[in-house]
């Protein structure tokens, strides 16, 4: 292996070795005359290569061949899974979705030697049947996918032996690569699970830090993987952990050590001193607390509120003493989280009490606005002498004990409709216009309105019965209804369920029954001029009222076919009938 980075790992004699690309590639030792622009261009090229990284399964007929899970350019995690072989010339590709509602789901498809993709076993079977393939069967193609946990465990078993074997060979590499990378990745580097491993990573090579990153990823497991969201900058994926790259920050951090050898040494020393607190801070910002090495696999989720408290506490501690901040953000994360939880609970109780006091003060102020002026004066004097909690209690007690004259309440709240004087009187008749009373002439059409014109309520009830119903069905039920409920006073007090039983031969009997009861009540109580203002009466009922009950047939333009016939007949015979 060269010093340019860990490109691939040999997995022994298990078959074709899958390619495992590190999410962070090592930069070779630059010469002394390396310029600032060259370093920036190299880092940018490395990021683009890693972003477009894809692992595919090789098309060899090896029964022990391991199958890598492909990583799409839009973002899919790469891993390996040990499976049976696929037919010669075919490729099996597995992609995992990282975004959307189906994040974490695996898509399996096979690529034929001709380059055709098959995403389901049915389409593959149709293809084989169409081409007359006899050597291949749909059962030879496996569309199932192992779980991510199983894939990780197999990858760990296959790769850890090779990782430990190459660990000794990489320990003699230069420390400049590690320090350069820790400086460039200051904002995005994930720390080891304990302070002892962090000290070991300083002395080891770049490969050692990559090994520690792989161990950390096993502790995080599927929790971080399912929380992947597309960031604004470039993102490289290493076993499901998103690492955001900021080119500007990387170039800015690299600008200090590429000018001269003396400055490079000072920056490297500074990177060693700052690597631990910066790594801990980036870990806290990711809202995942990784416990000590003894409790591997357990993760502590940090909420957004706790994260804000952590930031505030770090600022205060850093202003006081740097030693205290490093001690708080180092390996003792469990104690820090417990202290942080207690502080969060205290602050939450304080804010809750403050919000309660503010809410009670607002209620008391609103209630006091309705009190008499002398009560307000006494209440304000007592409020000045009392504490905030006793102020609220005193204001509520005054509001409950002191009484206001009944006349003021009636004058303010009670309307004229509900006053006692109005209730003692009988129901006032509707104040209609002083229409000219007239008797509509009998026509050859024999409409029911010609019989009920003398009682507007009965005529309007008939229009409700005839609405979207034939006269043969509605008129017999109408006479039964008028026998049981002869007036509006009786109908307004009737139970709508009884009326509904009577109207069952007609459609919409429940709706008609409720409409009749409410219409009868408004007919007696509401001040109306035309019946279209009442509940349940439309244009048909209003036109019938104006033609048969009121002498306004000349101003009416009916739309009902029966009313149209009667209206036309009136216009043709109004001179013979001496109608004005």
From Swiss-Prot:
The active site is at 560. The keyword Nucleus applies. Keywords: Disease variant, DNA damage, DNA repair, DNA-binding, Hydrolase, Nucleus, Phosphoprotein. This is Methyl-CpG-binding domain protein 4. SUPFAM superfamilies: DNA-binding domain, DNA-glycosylase. InterPro entries: DNA-bd_dom_sf (IPR016177), DNA_glycosylase (IPR011257), MBD4 (IPR017352), MeCP2/MBD4 (IPR045138), Methyl_CpG_DNA-bd (IPR001739). The keyword Nucleus applies. Changing residue 560 to A: Loss of DNA N-glycosylase activity. Its EC number is 3.2.2.-. It holds the Pfam family MBD. The modification Phosphoserine is found at residues 318, 428. GO terms for molecular function: DNA binding; DNA endonuclease activity; DNA N-glycosylase activity; pyrimidine-specific mismatch base pair DNA N-glycosylase activity; satellite DNA binding. PANTHER family: METHYL-CPG-BINDING DOMAIN PROTEIN 4 (PTHR15074:SF7), METHYL-CPG-BINDING PROTEIN (PTHR15074). Residues 76-148 form the MBD domain. Changing residue 468 to W: In UVM1; loss of DNA N-glycosylase activity. GO terms for biological process: depyrimidination; DNA repair; response to estradiol. The gene is MBD4. Its main location: nucleus. Signal peptide: none annotated. One of its GO terms (cellular component) is nucleus. It comes from Homo sapiens. It comes from the Eukaryota. Mismatch-specific DNA N-glycosylase involved in DNA repair. Has thymine glycosylase activity and is specific for G:T mismatches within methylated and unmethylated CpG sites. Can also remove uracil or 5-fluorouracil in G:U mismatches. Has no lyase activity. Was first identified as methyl-CpG-binding protein. It is an enzyme of class 3 (hydrolase). It is linked to Tumor predisposition syndrome 2: An autosomal recessive condition characterized by predisposition to develop a variety of tumors or malignancies, including acute myeloid leukemia, myelodysplastic syndrome, colorectal adenomatous polyposis and carcinoma, and uveal melanoma. Melanoma, uveal, 1: Most common intraocular malignancy, arising from melanocytes in the iris, ciliary body, or choroid. Metastases develop in more than 30% of case patients, almost invariably in the liver, with poor prognosis. It is found in: Nucleus. Interacts with MLH1. The lineage of its organism: Eukaryota, Metazoa, Chordata, Craniata, Vertebrata.
């Amino acid at each position: 292996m060269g010093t340019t980075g860990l490109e691939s790992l040999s997995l022994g004699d298990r078959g074709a070795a899958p390619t495992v690309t590190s999410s962070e590639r090592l930069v070779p030792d630059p010469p002394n005359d390396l310029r600032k622009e060259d370093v920036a261009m190299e880092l940018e090229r490395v990021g683009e290569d890693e972003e477009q990284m894809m692992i595919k399964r090789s098309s060899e007929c090896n029964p022990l061949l391991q199958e890598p899970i492909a990583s799409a350019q839009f973002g899919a995690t790469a891993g390996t899974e040990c499976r049976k072989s696929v037919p010669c010339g075919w490729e099996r590709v597995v992609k995992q979705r990282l975004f959307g509602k189906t994040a974490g789901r695996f898509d399996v498809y096979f690529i034929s030697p001709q380059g055709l993709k098959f995403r389901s076993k049915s389409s593959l079977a149709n293809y084989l049947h169409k081409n007359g393939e006899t050597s291949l069967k749909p059962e030879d193609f496996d569309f199932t996918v192992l779980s991510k946990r199983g894939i990780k465990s197999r990858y760990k078993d296959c790769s850890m032996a090779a990782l430990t074997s190459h660990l000794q060979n990489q320990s003699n590499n230069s420390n400049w690569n590690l320090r350069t990378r820790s400086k460039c990745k200051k904002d995005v580097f994930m720390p080891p699970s304990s302070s002892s491993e962090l000290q070991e990573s300083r002395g080891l090579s770049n490969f050692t830090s990559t090994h520690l990153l792989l161990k950390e990823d096993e502790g995080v497991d599927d929790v971080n993987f399912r929380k992947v969201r597309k960031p604004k900058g470039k993102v490289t994926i290493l076993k499901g952990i998103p690492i955001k790259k900021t080119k500007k920050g990387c170039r800015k951090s690299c600008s200090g050590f590429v000018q001269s050898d003396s400055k490079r040494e000072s920056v490297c020393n500074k990177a060693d001193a700052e690597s631990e607190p910066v790594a801990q801070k980036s870990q806290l910002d990711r809202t995942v607390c990784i416990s000590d090495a003894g409790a591997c696999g357990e993760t502590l989720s940090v909420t957004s509120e706790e994260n804000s408290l952590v930031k505030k506490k770090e600022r205060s501690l850093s202003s006081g003493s740097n030693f205290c901040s490093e001690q708080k953000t180092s390996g003792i994360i469990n104690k820090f989280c417990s202290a942080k939880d207690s502080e969060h609970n205290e602050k939450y109780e304080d804010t809750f009490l403050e919000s309660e006091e503010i809410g009670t003060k607002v209620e008391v102020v609103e209630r006091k606005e309705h009190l008499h002026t002398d009560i307000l004066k006494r209440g304000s004097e007592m409020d000045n002498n009392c504490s905030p909690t006793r102020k609220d209690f005193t204001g509520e007690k005054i509001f409950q004990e002191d009484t206001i004259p009944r006349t003021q309440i009636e004058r303010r709240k009670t309307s004229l409709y509900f006053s006692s004087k109005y209730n003692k009187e009988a129901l006032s008749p509707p104040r209609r216009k002083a229409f000219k009373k007239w008797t509509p002439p009998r026509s050859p059409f024999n409409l029911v309105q010609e019989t009920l014109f003398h009682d507007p309520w009965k005529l309007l009830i008939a229009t409700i019965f005839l609405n979207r119903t034939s006269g043969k069905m509605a008129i017999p039920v109408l006479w039964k209804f008028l026998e049981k409920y002869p007036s509006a006073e009786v109908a307004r007090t009737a139970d709508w369920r009884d009326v509904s039983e009577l109207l069952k031969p007609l459609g919409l009997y429940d709706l008609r029954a409720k409409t009749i009861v409410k219409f009868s009540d408004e007919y007696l109580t509401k001040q109306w001029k035309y019946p279209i203002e009442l509940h349940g009466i439309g244009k048909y009922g209003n036109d019938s009222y104006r033609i048969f009950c009121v002498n306004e047939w000349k101003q009416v333009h009916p739309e009902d076919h029966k009313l149209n016939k009667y209206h036309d007949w009136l216009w043709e015979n109004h001179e013979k009938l001496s109608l004005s």
